Amino acid sequence: MTMEKTIVLASGNEGKAREFRAILEPMGYKIVLQKELNISSPEETGKSFLENAILKARYASEQSGMWALADDSGLAVDALNGAPGIYSARYAGEHGDEKACNIKLLDALKNVPDGKRAARYYCALCLVRHKDDPVPLTVLSSWEGSIGHNEKGSGGFGYDPLFIVTGRDCTAAELPPQIKNLISHRGRALAALTYKLEHNLS
């Protein structure tokens, strides 16, 4: 494994790491979580998923001296004017308290009928080869669905138990991982990124 094939993932989220490793490691890229290198996360000051992904990737690359890949993703609910949006992970206040976020989302939608519960996941990815990379690889993908009335399924993470996938009679948390990795916002974004990697960087 050559050094440039090791990529620092600018995240401490093990759920995300599993999805990235499943797709990138067969291509020869070793994924190392930033927390394994004692790198903390910078303050997310961007106004969009893409801005935050670029910010996090540059910071991880600066701290590690290595290639860095950042994901900024979240859920946008139409009835809530796009909330929780870029604040998805800290919607309930404490960053990463998934259960509290799901409870708050259900409460916010308690009077919203089924036909008006449309939502979509977004995933922005940014890969930089060094902290000042003038041409970072970026992609933005989405995944359509709606918000259910209660949690279903034990797979996935985040809002997956509430996110009913358009065209499938199940939540994202009920999908087998190999299916989710193909059709989700992150799966699609990773597919687009790997295409760019194969054609631009190999």
Predicted features, each with a name:
Residues 2-8, 14-202:
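Anionic-ligand binding patches
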